[in-house]
Amino acid sequence: MPDESQRIQSTASHGLNNTPEQPDPIKLDVHGQIPPWLSGALYRTGPGTFSIPTKYGYEWKPGHWFDGLGLNHKFDIKPNGEVWYRSRKSCPQAELAIMESGARSSFSFGPSDPCETYFQKFTTFFKRAAGMIPPHPPEEDDACVTLTPNMPGFAVPSSHTTNKVNGAEYIVAKTDADTLSILDPETLKVLGPAHYQDLSPALKGASFCAAHACTDPINGNVFNHVYKFGSSAGYTAFRIRGKGSDRGHLTVLTDIVDAPPAYLHSSCLTGKYFILCIWQGDIKWCVFPPLPLITLLNKKLSSQGWVNYPLPPQYPGCHCWLGPQTGSAILRY
């Protein structure tokens, strides 16, 4: 008989198996009863593809669970207690690109694949930095960390129409980079790309951001930050209006230029303050031109992940408390 640790390990291993998409809704078996007041649409997202055969004869596998390609899920809960389910891959074109190239060109959390050579990585990023590689389709961008219905500042692309689902005209899928996707709330199809920097020229050049934006439950305002590399490197905290005639308008709260680039997965929002907790999870970057692509190249050339561990004790964390209306720095330590 396997012991408890073996049983848990065996069960957890299923989380690394490929999950096929289910684009057409199917009725699920329900054990028990769901009260009518729970009816509605439940959206979930997360990694779903962890092994992709390549034309070179080997299988691509991510070095970290977070690096699995995304799968978006929708559960339609009916007033009569029925539950219908459908799912769709978030970046099918990225899967095809991996089959063809044998590697993934976007940033990753885990160690680099040893099958990817240094020269292959350098050439890919050099070409993309030089503009020699055309923009890739939006379905190659994998945003599969958080989903927000009707997020202010964004909209359904003019070339598409959608059906409202419980008031949602569109879904914004987010990740830890300024690479968002607009989803159809009914079919989960990727309608197009989206970026925070499209909302304001002040965010131009944004690379990283928090996948978990903060939303004020009273007025619907959305708070987040971006990090920009280069000559004007630093954090930019911002607010997107959630209601009123200026809904979707982005206001920069403050710029923080004297803190190191860190991996910030989320931030904090109270009734009075928007808080950035800049911890010691510094992102690796090069000493030569500090461009975002060069930063990612440096990460990809490393045999480690893209966050600089262990935590350096000589660099204390930094908490920035910002007034959500004015953006003034109330407290910093």
Label for each model-derived stretch:
Residues 1-157:
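N-terminal regions that are enriched for targeting/export leaders
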Residues 33, 60-64, 161-162, 171, ...:
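Beta-strand elements of modular eukaryotic interaction domains
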Residues 41-44, 57-64, 74, 168-175, ...:
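Short beta-strand elements that form the blades of beta-propeller/WD-repeat-like
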Residues 68, 209, 262-263, 326:
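Beta-rich catalytic cores
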Residues 70-74, 232-249, 287-333:
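Beta-propeller blade signature
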Residues 84-94, 191-198, 247-256:
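Beta-propeller fold detector
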Residues 96-246:
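Well-ordered mid-protein domain cores that form the structural environment of catalytic cofactors
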Residues 223-227, 233, 237-239, 255-259, ...:
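Long, low-complexity intrinsically disordered regions
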